[in-house]
Amino acid sequence: MYNFIRQITEGRLGKTLERVKLAYPLDGLGKSLSKQALEYHYGKLYKAYCDRYNAGEGDADFNEAGAYLHSIYFSQFRAPKGSNKPDGSVLTLIEEHFKSWEKFQEAFEKAAMAIQGSGWVYLAKDGEIKTIKNHQIKKDIVILVDWWEHSFCIDYQADKKAYLNNQWKIIDWSIINARLT
């Protein structure tokens, strides 16, 4: 299988892009992201970035970056279970830069809510919260939240804060910690 994230990170692009395989069923993220939202977001929009890139349609850089970001986004989730708090290296990074998980969440929400229009918000490997306008490949992503309307409108309409708060419930911290190694 074409490992898109690794090839971008290592700077080696293949001739075709494929979506990452989900580690959960389309109905496996509970109320955080519905089956309907995933069918549309993962099944149509993310797929379209790969398909357009592979067909040479549209802006190749835009489609490539869109596919890359969605690969990171969809690969960081797991089914919701219990209290979902960070641990390991990511918790250390968060506490070094924000003092606590709760203060990190507040800072992340503030950065996300400040985005005018669409984009992405992420925790970077240097401990900063950063935003991406449009689509751009960034190699320092630890936690990534899609802030385009298609990400939250199906399940949350315009309630971006509820969307963000429910993202924390499905983050797979083992994957996030692996991004820091």
Task: Please place each PLM-identified region on the residue numbering.
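Feature for soluble, non-membrane regions of globular proteins
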Residues: Y2-T181
